[in-house]
């Protein structure tokens, strides 16, 4: 509500999306917000010829949760998703927890690719570098985009590792 309040006070047009209710925002262009947990949401975009699902950091790590989202989206052409942990994963001594979190994240992506059958997956959320002296140890087990490519190399999907200023046709 704070974001909405800020925009309306500054005279911006604001349209708050209702969950799982498609909004037509142009000819052949619909967006749907999918609630995930308490704070997160996914964005599903449909154009005349593409279906794009941005899971960002949604917690889609079980078949049942993937099935719930699939009921809204069906198969998609492009899947955007988080590829590593981006938050605290224990103190310095908890290396095994961080390694497990990284492995689980790659397994989550594989599950998502199996369910949504995208033509391409874009690992984009998690370009994090822990730079503070007190937390830089968290970098010891993060995934990199190449880890996603290696995990999915036997699946029928193009892993599109984008860099700043890249764009999709």
Across the structure, where does each feature detected by a protein language model lie?
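Short beta-alpha junction loops
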Residues: 1, 127-128, 165-166
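Glycine-centered loop/turn motif at secondary-structure junctions
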Residues: 11, 49, 117, 156-158
